[in-house]
Amino acid sequence: MTNITQLMTAFFDFLSSQDKNWSLCTFPFMASFLVFFAIYIGLNRYRQTWTKAYVIAFSLFFAFKANGVLMWLLPIVTISSWYLTRFMMRLKRGKVRKIGLAIVILTELLPLLYYKYSNFTLEIFHELLRSNFTPEKMLLPVGISFFTFQAISYTVDIYKGRYPKTAELIDYTFYLTFFPLLIAGPITRAEVLLPQVQTPKDNVNENLVYKGLWLIICGLIKKALIADYIAQYNNIVFDAPASQSGFGNLMGVLGFSVQIYFDFSGYSDLAIGVAALMGYELKDNFRFPYQSLNLTEFWHRWHIALSTWFRDYLYIPLGGNRKGELRTYLNSFLAMIVAGLWHGASWMFIVWGVLHGIGLVIHKFCRNNGLDKIPDNKYTKGISWFITFSYVSLAWIFFRAADMTTATTLIDNILHTISLADAYTFLMEYPLWLAVVLISLEIHSIRETDYNWLQSKFINSSWLVKLCIFAVVMQLVINLSHHSIQPFIYTQF
């Protein structure tokens, strides 16, 4: 009897307590998802309304585990966004409805502006006044940047007629609270997810389920076996760059470039994979971005959901490339600064955005003036790749560093203290780490057609082969992660 009481107490403690490390690859979530999924499969055969309500309830539980009491922000934003968008569409077309659109977008932005940017704004204001005021640190609701942008995209798409009609409240709530997308996206358009939510799912699409399992396996490998391992040395470098040699600093920058890709694309794979298991097909968020030969191509391959969001809801409304060459450059530059601010209220993210903005402007200028017409051979492609990857890695320094002093110290060490002796010492001290980084880059260099071939081979293999591969990966994750997978980088945004 005592054991049952203790078990029940532990169960209710789990249900009623926040977990700051809660995400798609933590073991408590995996256990919860197995129970959820078993019931979901059973419910899916009956009324769709019950299934939707069940998924929404689990999504809100997911939000509570990640955010605690701040989870109430999600249903508040959802309901207010839905009602205001419906009200906006009842307004007279023209200037009145346009004003309504502005009011709805501002209302959707208010929680994000308050929780993410109010302290930063106050700090700037008091620095200008030279006062000693220090605002209290404010907790940032996990995923707020993602579900806010998703709400805005729905409102604008309804206004523009890109999505034919406003959804029912239960469908919109499902769309905005869908738990795989909640913590770190990818930001998903209404036209992608809502039609699938509104369509009954009587039969399981086996190929989609197997694709989901493939993506989950890829996501676990990327995050738990690659990104978290590489992060160990990266953290040493960025916490105290002066304690490492110039070559060690250079390797830390290379390591973080690899880490952030495998960390974030790993989460995207997990999110898209979990959604696929449930019968929902989402768009890819990454397409081998470090294979890019210029910065424009990089942004067509990196965090595709965010880059296309800024293209459609900021760059094009600002005029895009329709108002002359100078305006095109300015629009690109402004879009990247806002992208930097989206990541966080910090001068470091602004610098990261400025660097990408400058890089995009330079590439557009060269392309518009015929300066990018160089011989198309493996040597020029290699040089283009090296310049692009190096520039992106340089920008990552400001993205990862805690402050400008850390970033400049690291860059100064790389430029002035590198030596062959330091390189040899590093190779002797961190051979396994370097091997993992180089192997990871080699994996990333795979052709998209070869990746698709591997995926199709997995999908078409027997269930026993799939089960064995999944079991081996899970065992590796358990053994190598020491039962503690680190939080995803993008959960802080």
Residue ranges of model-derived segments:
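Membrane-embedded transmembrane alpha-helical bundles that form the catalytic cores
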Residues: T2-Q492
